[in-house]
Every structure is written in structure tokens, then in C-alpha cells.
């Protein structure tokens, strides 16, 4: 007699759902998870080893519960790059931006509360909402994947959400949200109740525009979420962080697990922050490759969404999954992200991008034959 998940007393809202995950396939070129394709530079690897070696001497003790040194350095990074002064009291860090989002929803969402996001957008927002017992509301986007301000305001007024998610640059479309739109949505949310507005800036270092950190001034219900997985090329580190009013930082600590950031994680992140200039140099290379992908895909004849991230959404396809498979058959893995008619490709190294472009050129020739 077989026994499966349906035989367990799983919460009703989790039944029939699937866990988050992109395919992990062994192919020559993997451009499906928006990772930074460049390995960490050797001087940084050596510095990580030094810091981890020092931390290892004290692993018999719990790590710094409040990650004071790390939060101080993150605040310095945000101040230097975000055109807005940020102090340690404004910063909180966790195991990836997903844990940051989880802690925010545990604090401000939960049973009997709601969260709204404007989809298609980062699917983990909805998944984490369900995991925390927060009812999820799918807000509208326009045909061009931008946020229709009038429709979004109406959705907020009707649903009265406790948490509002705005992802900019947006994943999976790559589109940025103008500051004036974010401000308008913040004001719309505050007009109905004291809602928390979370701006997810996971890809902001790749944007043509600036961070929205300056909007934090005078807006205690606004949160900016970040990650070290993308621009810092440290997806394996799992380090996310937020900037917000000090009261928000105090609030999320009500739900954090004790000593949630390991000494090894803190040591590694601190080493990476010492090499910010080098790592952001790779970001400039990836931005150039992203722009090249946009131009080349349009020249080949595909529709391409404007991108402010390290990936490009392209289409349109009658059967996107079939095209995904045809690209995979040519040794290149891209992402079928569930947006009907569209696929997403991460910006890789020039050689990886050439392999991808060769594959889609070949496909286009076959389609036109």
C-alpha cells in the first residue's frame, strides 16, 4: 500500500501545490536561474578562507545573534551605492532574501491577513505567503508587463491588503517600476490601512536606474529587500537583507529563529563586502551582455521585453515549452517561467550568450523555412 503526501495531515491551502524550483539539468550552457556566471575572484576566495578559518576557531560558541558587524558593512554598502544614508539600525539580514520575505510575512501577514503582488512576478512571494498562512491576491499587470497604476490602485482599494509586494526590476519580465508608481502605490496602500509595502530589489544593481532607497525617508511602512545572490555572485552563500525604519527591524526580530545566521555565513558575506568594487565590475560586464542579448534577439526577429535585470524575457511563441525543449536540445537551458508565450534567458558569459544566440538563430531559420 503506497503512502504519499496526500495521506498526511497537510494544511488545506498547501494541498495540490508544487514546491519552487527550476530544472537542474547537466547541459553545456545553463542560463535559467539568473546566477552570476563568473566565479568569485581568487583574492576573494582566499579572503573567504581566512575569515572562515578564523570563525571556525569559535564554532563551539553561537554566532553573533544580531550580526552587528555584517549589518554595519551592509549599511555602508547601501549608503555608498543607494544615494541615501543607511545605518545599522535600518538593516536586517537573513538566509537569502526569501527568508527576509518569510520573516516579513510572519510578522505582518499570517492567518486572517492578505498580501498582494502584481503578476507575473517573483513566484516565491505567493509561495511564502501560503507557507505563512497569508492569503495571496494576484494583482494585475498591463499587456506590456508594466503595472497599470489605475488598476493596481483599484485592486489595493478593493482587497485592503496587509502587505504589498512591488518587484523592481521585476522577475521574470525584467521591467522596472518607476519611482512615482511606487510612491503612488504606497500612498494607495496607506489610504486603506497601515499596510507594509515591500520593494523587492534583488536585481537593482543591474538596472539602468537608481535604487528606491531614498523613498524610505519619512515612510515607515516601506521596506526595500536585497540579496547577495545576484550582483555579488554569491548565490551559494544564501544571504539576503532589508533596509527599513528601525521599528521594522525590531519587529522582524520577533519571529527570527535564534542565531539564525551562522558564523560561516557572516564571515563569508563580510569577505565579499570587502571586494565590492571588483564584484560590481562583473555587474557592468553582465549589463553589457544583457543589452547585447536584447539587441541580438530583436535583430533575429523575437519580441523582447525591456530589461533592467541580468536576464531577458523573449517571445512570442505559440508553444513556449516546445521552444524551450528545442533550445535545450541544442545544449542550452533557459527558463520556461510560466508566462504564456514567453521564455527567459539569463545573461551569461559572452561565450554562453553566443551559444544561446546561435541556437535561437537556428530555430528562427527553421521556423521561416
From Swiss-Prot:
Which pathway?
Amino-acid biosynthesis; L-histidine biosynthesis; L-histidine from 5-phospho-alpha-D-ribose 1-diphosphate: step 7/9
Instruction: Give a yes or no for keyword Amino-acid biosynthesis in this entry.
Output: yes
Q: Which GO terms are recorded in the biological process aspect for this UniProt protein?
A: L-histidine biosynthetic process
Amino-acid biosynthesis listed as a keyword: yes
Q: Which reaction does it catalyse?
A: L-histidinol phosphate + 2-oxoglutarate = 3-(imidazol-4-yl)-2-oxopropyl phosphate + L-glutamate
Main EC class of this protein? transferase
**Organism of derivation:** Streptomyces avermitilis (strain ATCC 31267 / DSM 46492 / JCM 5070 / NBRC 14893 / NCIMB 12804 / NRRL 8165 / MA-4680)
Name the EC number(s). 2.6.1.9
Chain positions found as N6-(pyridoxal phosphate)lysine: 230
The protein in question is named Histidinol-phosphate aminotransferase
Q: Which InterPro entries match?
A: Aminotrans_II_pyridoxalP_BS, Aminotransferase_I/II_large, HisP_aminotrans, PyrdxlP-dep_Trfase, PyrdxlP-dep_Trfase_major, PyrdxlP-dep_Trfase_small
For this UniProt record, the keywords arranged alphabetically read as follows: Amino-acid biosynthesis, Aminotransferase, Histidine biosynthesis, Pyridoxal phosphate, Transferase
The terms under GO molecular function for this entry are: histidinol-phosphate transaminase activity; pyridoxal phosphate binding
- Gene designation per UniProt: hisC
Q: How does it assemble?
A: Homodimer.
Amino acid at each position: 500500500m503506497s503512502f504519499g503526501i496526500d495521506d498526511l495531515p497537510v494544511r488545506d491551502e498547501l494541498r495540490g501545490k508544487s514546491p519552487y524550483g527550476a530544472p537542474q539539468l547537466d547541459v553545456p550552457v545553463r542560463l535559467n536561474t539568473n546566477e552570476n556566471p563568473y566565479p568569485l575572484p581568487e583574492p576573494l576566495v582566499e579572503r573567504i578562507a581566512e575569515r572562515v578559518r578564523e570563525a571556525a576557531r569559535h564554532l563551539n560558541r553561537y554566532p553573533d545573534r544580531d550580526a552587528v558587524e555584517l549589518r554595519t558593512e551592509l549599511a555602508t554598502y547601501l549608503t555608498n551605492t543607494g544615494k541615501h544614508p543607511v545605518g545599522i539600525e535600518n538593516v536586517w539580514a537573513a538566509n537569502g532574501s526569501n527568508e527576509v520575505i518569510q520573516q516579513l510575512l510572519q510578522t505582518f501577514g499570517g492567518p486572517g491577513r492578505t498580501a498582494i503582488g502584481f503578476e507575473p512576478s517573483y513566484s516565491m512571494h505567493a509561495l511564502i505567503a501560503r507557507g505563512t498562512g497569508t492569503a495571496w491576491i494576484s494583482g494585475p499587470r498591463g499587456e506590456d508587463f508594466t503595472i497599470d497604476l489605475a488598476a493596481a490602485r483599484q485592486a489595493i482599494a478593493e482587497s485592503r491588503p496587509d502587505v504589498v509586494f512591488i518587484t523592481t526590476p521585476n522577475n521574470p519580465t525584467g521591467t522596472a517600476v518607476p519611482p512615482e508608481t511606487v510612491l503612488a502605490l504606497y500612498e494607495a496602500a496607506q489610504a486603506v490601512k497601515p499596510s507594509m509595502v515591500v520593494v523587492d530589489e534583488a536585481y537593482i544593481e543591474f538596472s539602468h536606474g537608481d535604487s528606491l532607497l531614498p523613498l524610505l525617508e519619512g515612510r515607515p511602512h516601506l521596506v526595500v529587500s536585497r540579496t547577495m545572490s545576484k550582483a555579488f555572485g554569491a548565490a551559494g552563500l544564501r544571504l539576503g537583507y532589508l533596509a527599513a525604519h528601525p521599528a521594522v527591524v525590531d519587529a522582524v526580530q520577533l519571529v527570527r529563529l535564534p542565531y539564525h545566521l551562522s558564523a560561516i555565513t557572516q564571515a563569508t558575506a563580510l569577505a565579499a563586502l570587502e571586494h565590492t568594487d571588483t564584484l560590481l565590475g562583473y555587474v557592468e560586464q553582465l549589463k553589457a551582455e544583457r543589452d547585447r542579448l536584447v539587441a541580438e534577439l530583436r535583430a533575429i526577429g523575437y519580441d523582447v521585453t525591456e530589461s533592467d535585470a541580468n536576464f531577458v524575457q523573449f517571445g512570442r511563441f505559440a508553444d513556449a515549452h516546445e521552444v524551450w525543449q528545442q533550445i535545450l536540445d541544442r545544449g542550452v537551458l533557459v527558463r520556461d517561467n510560466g508566462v504564456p508565450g514567453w521564455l527567459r534567458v539569463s545573461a551569461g558569459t559572452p561565450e554562453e550568450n553566443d551559444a544561446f544566440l546561435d541556437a535561437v538563430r537556428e530555430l528562427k531559420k527553421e521556423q521561416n523555412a
